[in-house]
Amino acid sequence: VLRFGKFVKTTQPGLNYHIPLPIETVKTPKVTKVNRMDIGFRSERDSGFSSGGVADVPEESLMLTGDENIVNIDFSVFWVIKDAGKFLFQIQDPEGTVKAAAETAMREVIAKSRIQQILTEGRAKIENETQEIIQSILDEYNSGIQVTQVQTQKSDPPDQVIDAFRDVQAARADMERSKNEAEAYAN
């Protein structure tokens, strides 16, 4: 409850009385709603597409890996409000704050990872590390936000080099196969 724009009290569920506008106003954030922030892409629900598709946002999704490759990552961050007072009064733009923290955290984790790990078996580890970093950033800001999940939607090489990347992968598989055949022949 705000009185003349200044925080006065937090009320509990049930019957509560407050002085009518313009003296007191009540802010009621949805603390049970799970919010979703998409990074690297915009879905139909975000941008008003009628085609049912998604639009890529390269300035958010292109990241440099630890082995100096570029990877295109789309991911979603799911979050809830854990402290309504902090959420309403400690940060001005909660969604912008979550987005900035998520981009920063993912770039930090990707910069420490190799491209092979990012594209194959390391996704769960990357998601967990990213979630921990986002939460620590939001806790530093006293935001009142709890990150519940980070979910990688897509992780691919950029479109311009995807064919060359697949050729390299096929060559590595052929090398492994030839090596295994040679070892089998030697035994």
Where do the model's predicted regions map?
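Short, charged, low-complexity patches
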Residues: I91-K99, E103, R123, E127, ...
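Solvent-exposed, non-transmembrane alpha-helical starts
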Residues: K86-I91, E127-N128, D159-V161
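Short beta-strand elements
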Residues: I115-T120, E140-T152
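Long, charge-rich amphipathic alpha-helical coiled-coil "stalk/tentacle" segments
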Residues: P157-N187
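A short, surface-exposed, charged and often Trp/Pro-enriched helix-loop connector in the C-terminal portion
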Residues: T97, A105-E129, L138
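Signal for well-folded cores of large energy- and translation-related assemblies
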Residues: R107, Q135-S143, Q169
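Hydrophobic membrane-anchoring helix/hairpin
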Residues: V1-I110
